Amino acid sequence: MRNHRISLQDIATLAGVTKMTVSRYIRSPKKVAKETGERIAKIMEEINYIPNRAPGMLLNAQSYTLGILIPSFQNQLFADILAGIESVTSEHNYQTLIANYNYDRDSEEESVINLLSYNIDGIILSEKYHTIRTVKFLRSATIPVVELMDVQGERLDMEVGFDNRQAAFDMVCTMLEKRVRHKILYLGSKDDTRDEQRYQGYCDAMMLHNLSPLRMNPRAISSIHLGMQLMRDALSANPDLDGVFCTNDDIAMGALLLCRERNLAVPEQISIAGFHGLEIGRQMIPSLASVITPRFDIGRMAAQMLLSKIKNNDHNHNTVDLGYQIYHGNTL
C-alpha cells in the first residue's frame, strides 16, 4: 500500500487553521499573520512537508517562477548575474528555473520551450540573438522577457546591459594613450555577437590611431588555458607584438601568465587588458587592466524589470544602460 501523501488539509488540521490559510502561507508567507505563519511553519517542519508546486504552476494565472537561460555554468560572469537576480527574487518569494545552453542557439531554443512548459511568469535571456523558433515561442507565450549584457540592436521586449562596442573602444584608446604601441592584437574566444561588438570597438580605436587591426578568434569557450594558448600562438606569429586586448578576463589572465612564463615584462614590453573586471584579475600581479561591467546590478535590474512588468503590464522602462568603468590596473 502506498504511503499517504500529506495534504494541505492535514497541515491545516494540525495547525488549527483553514486549508486556504495554509495555501496562502505557502504562496506568500508575508500575507499571513506572523503567529499563524510560525505555527504553520513549525508543523511543516515537524512532518517534513515539501509543497508540490507543479499543479499550481500549471493551473494558476501566476506560478511565481522565473526562467533563466545562461550559456555557461563555468563562467564567473554568470554566477554574478545569477546572484543579482536571486537578491530580488528571494525577497518576493519567486523561484527560479535555470537552464544552461552551452552557447548553442538550438540548445537555447529547446531550453526555452521546456521552461515555458512550466508556466513561468517571465524569462531572462543572456543574449539577444535567437533562433526564429525561439522568438516565435516567446512571442506566443506573451510573458515579459529581459535580455542581458547588451543594449545595441533590436530587442524582444526589455533589455539591460551596456554598450560593448563603446566599452572596447574606450579601453583600447586608454591602452594607446598610456604608452606608445604599434601592434595591439585582439584576442577573442567563441564567436558570439558581444565578442563581435567588442572587436568592432577595438577596430574603431585602432583606426583612429592609424593602426591596423589584428585578430585571433578561435571557436572555443573561454578559459585561462585558452588564453595562454592564444598568447603563445600570437607571439609566434607576431614577434614584435606589444599589446593585446582580450574579449574577457579569462583570456587576459592566460595571456598574462604566458608572458610571465616567457619572462616578458608587462606592461613595459607588452600591454594587456581584459573585459569584465573579475576580482581574480584585479588580484593578479601585476593587477589586470579591464573593463569593469556591473554584472550583479544587471542581474538585479533584470529581475526588478520582470517583476515590475508582471505586476503592471503597462511598464515601459524597456532599455536600461548601466554603463561600465575602465580599470587601469598595472598592465597598461
From Swiss-Prot:
SUPFAM superfamilies with a match to the protein in the record: lambda repressor-like DNA-binding domains, Periplasmic binding protein-like I
Ranges where the HTH lacI-type domain occurs: 6-60
Annotated region of DNA binding: 8-27
InterPro entries, sorted: Cro/C1-type_HTH, HTH_LacI, Lambda_DNA-bd_dom_sf, Peripla_BP/Lac1_sug-bd_dom, Peripla_BP_I
Keywords assigned: DNA-binding, Gluconate utilization, Transcription, Transcription regulation
Domain of life assignment: Bacteria
GO molecular function, one term: DNA-binding transcription factor activity
PROSITE patterns assigned: HTH_LACI_1, HTH_LACI_2
GO BP of this protein: D-gluconate metabolic process; regulation of DNA-templated transcription
A Pfam family it matches: LacI
Its biological purpose: Idn operon regulator. May repress gntKU and gntT genes when growing on L-idonate.
Name of the protein described by the UniProt record: HTH-type transcriptional regulator IdnR
